[in-house]
């Protein structure tokens, strides 16, 4: 199960310490469904990890137990965080979707439950991998929770129920739009790692997000 046997505390590892990851960790630490403790953090960028740690430590001092040796930076940091939380713990996976299949697969392999944000992968191959991992999780009795917030909205569920009952008649076409400020991308300056530069600008590169 998700609960650690010795003290019933749910151990959390945060992988991806940006705004969404920090928010998801805060949600988990403020949950009323069980005692929770953040024990490991991982990110490619040290500044993101530091900012997230300071914010969470300030808000949940008694529940954030992440000493320097359990704050991991780099592309392999996710492995160290998953190992630190251990079997039965929970990984909060909130990186950009390029890394989701790799990280979630490793967590399930190590016996760690997963909460992952959307989107689940940037391409069909990654999506198929996530579906394969889901089957593996079922076989191991591990849980994968997904951040599809609209599916948890009772108002939206009621609206969809009405549509399915025919309240709008026969639907022949649906168009959905999202209004956004748009993406501005400056030229690559050439004085740093281009991969890291692209990761800082995820919405400009399809492979990242």
Predicted segments with their positions:
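N-terminal glycine-/serine-/threonine-rich beta1-alpha1-beta2 phosphate-ribose binding loop
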Residues: 1-112, 125, 129-141
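A cross-family glycoside hydrolase active-site/sugar-binding cleft signature
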Residues: 94, 117, 145-147
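Short helix/strand-capping hinge loops at secondary-structure junctions
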Residues: 111-113, 117-119
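Conserved PLP phosphate-binding loop immediately N-terminal to the Schiff-base lysine helix
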Residues: 123-125, 154
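Hydrophobic residues within beta-strands of alpha/beta enzymes
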Residues: 91, 114, 171-174
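Predominantly a Rossmann-like dinucleotide-binding segment in NAD(P)-dependent oxidoreductases
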Residues: 16-21, 140-145, 150-209
């Amino acid at each position: 199960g998700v609960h650690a046997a010795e003290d019933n505390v749910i151990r959390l590892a945060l992988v991806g310490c940006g705004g969404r990851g920090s928010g998801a960790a805060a949600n988990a630490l403020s949950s009323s469904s069980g005692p929770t403790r953040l024990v490991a953090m991982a990110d490619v960028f040290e500044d993101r990890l530091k900012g997230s740690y300071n914010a969470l430590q300030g808000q949940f001092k008694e529940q954030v137990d992440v000493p320097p040796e359990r704050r991991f930076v780099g592309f392999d940091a996710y492995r160290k965080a998953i190992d630190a939380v251990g079997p039965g713990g929970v990984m909060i996976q909130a990186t950009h979707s390029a890394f989701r299949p790799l990280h979630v697969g490793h967590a399930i392999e190590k016996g760690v439950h997963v909460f992952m944000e959307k989107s689940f992968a940037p391409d069909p191959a990654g999506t198929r991998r996530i579906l394969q991992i889901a089957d593996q999780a079922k076989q191991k009795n591990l849980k994968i929770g997904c951040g599809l917030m609209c599916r948890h909205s009772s108002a939206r569920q009621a609206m969809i129920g009405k549509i399915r009952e025919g309240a709008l008649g026969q639907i022949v076409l649906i168009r959905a739009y999202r209004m956004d400020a748009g993406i501005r991308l400056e030229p690559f300056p050439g004085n740093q790692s281009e991969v890291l530069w692209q990761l800082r600008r995820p919405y400009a590169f399809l492979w990242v997000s």
